[in-house]
């Protein structure tokens, strides 16, 4: 498997796959092309035998000088549980450290139990929200009306 920095042309390969990889959920509109053009040093693609099998889109915060943010991560369903996500995250963590940052943040939907489990397994902590649902701290309407989110933070120090 090869991990490389994302290129603008990867947008045209990845976006048609996103909804399929998410079991039909409409997710592709959450990843506009600007991420592929402006965050190439902190976004990565995983390929196996020339086939795209995963990606991570992240960036360094302009507002918080010690922080970075993971915006979107996907692994081909047939390649899950092969440590592809772990390699993508580690590449991102290394890029974050090289830029003298030590805090990584990300969010997910409360319905995405796989993502919640994965992030806690990777050492992320769930940040306090404004309510608890099924034992999970939730931030109500974080991304707009009826768009609740679970917020994560990981310290790399």
List where the protein language model places each region.
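Conserved GNAT acetyl-CoA-binding A-motif
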Residues: 96-108
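Conserved acetyl-CoA-binding loop-helix of GNAT-fold acetyltransferases
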Residues: 75, 81-94, 117-121
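Short hydrophobic/aromatic beta-strand or adjacent loop that forms the aromatic wall/cage
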Residues: 41, 145-151
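A generic structural micro-feature
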Residues: 67, 143-146
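Conserved catalytic-core motifs of GNAT/GCN5-like acyltransferases
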Residues: 105-108, 120-144
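Conserved N-terminal entry element of GNAT/NAT acetyltransferase domains
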Residues: 1-9, 150, 155-157
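Acetyl-CoA-dependent GNAT
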Residues: 8-12, 16-78, 89-91, 156
């Amino acid at each position: 498997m090869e991990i490389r920095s994302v290129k603008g042309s990867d947008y045209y390969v990845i976006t048609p796959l996103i909804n399929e990889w998410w079991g039909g959920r409409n997710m592709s509109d959450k990843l506009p092309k600007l991420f592929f053009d402006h965050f190439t040093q902190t976004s990565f693609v995983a390929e196996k035998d020339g086939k795209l099998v995963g990606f991570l889109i992240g960036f360094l915060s302009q507002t918080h000088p010690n922080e970075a943010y993971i915006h979107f991560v996907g692994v081909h369903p047939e390649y899950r549980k092969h440590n592809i996500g772990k390699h993508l995250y580690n590449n991102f963590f290394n890029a974050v450290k090289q830029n003298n940052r030590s805090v990584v943040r990300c969010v997910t939907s409360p319905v995405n139990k796989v993502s919640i489990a994965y992030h806690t397994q990777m050492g992320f902590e769930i940040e306090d929200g404004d309510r608890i649902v099924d034992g999970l701290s939730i931030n109500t309407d974080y991304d707009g009306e009826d768009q609740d989110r679970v917020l994560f933070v990981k310290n790399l120090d």
